[in-house]
Every structure is written in C-alpha cells, then in structure tokens.
C-alpha cells in the first residue's frame, strides 16, 4: 500500500540494579523494534528512553511500551484498523519476544 506505511516507536526505562537478572530494557526495545519493522514494513520512529513514565519506571522486570501507530494520522489510522496489519503486529511482537528470551533466559 503506497503511502500507507505505519510508524512505530518504542519507549523504555533505563535499567537499574533492581531489574531481574541481566535482562535489559534497551536490548528488549532494540529487538522488538527490529522485529516490528521487519515484520510490518513500518517506519522506525525511534527508540526513546523515558524515565518519567510510571508504567515503566516502577517495574522490576523488563518493560517497554510499543506505540504501534498514530491515530492522529488518517492514513495510519486506516492501516491500523486492517486485520492484515494487526496480524503482522502480533506476529512481530511474538517473534521479538521469542528472540529476546532465547538470548536472555539461558540455563
């Protein structure tokens, strides 16, 4: 769909000592962004460190926020509402999580 590419942005909180094991928020954000861009063909709007978001800064485990698109953009809104794009997003998120945990949860 020409002109219908989405924009994906990933937000993360920098790690601190209380984070479980060696799991890394920045690494999770990078892996997820790569998986989403490759799986959906969307544009990379960036990976952004956010220390001010309680939903991220109060966790003791890896945590990110994936912004899958922006409804303020009419073309993007149409894209986000399609089953095909939603399925690509879900598959990409699953692939990214599988990659992240395969690298980080070794015995």
Predicted regions and their residues:
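Active-site-proximal helix/loop segments of hydrolytic enzymes
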Residues: 1-107
């Amino acid at each position: 769909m020409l002109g219908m590419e989405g924009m994906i942005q990933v937000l993360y909180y920098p790690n601190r000592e209380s984070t479980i094991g060696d799991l890394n928020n920045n690494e999770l954000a990078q892996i997820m962004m790569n998986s989403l861009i490759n799986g959906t063909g969307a544009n990379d709007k960036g990976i952004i460190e956010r220390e001010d978001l309680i939903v991220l800064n109060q966790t003791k485990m890896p945590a990110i926020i994936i912004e899958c698109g922006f409804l303020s953009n009419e073309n993007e809104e149409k894209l986000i509402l399609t089953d095909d794009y939603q399925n690509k997003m879900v598959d990409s998120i699953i692939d990214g999580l599988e990659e992240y945990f395969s690298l980080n949860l070794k015995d």
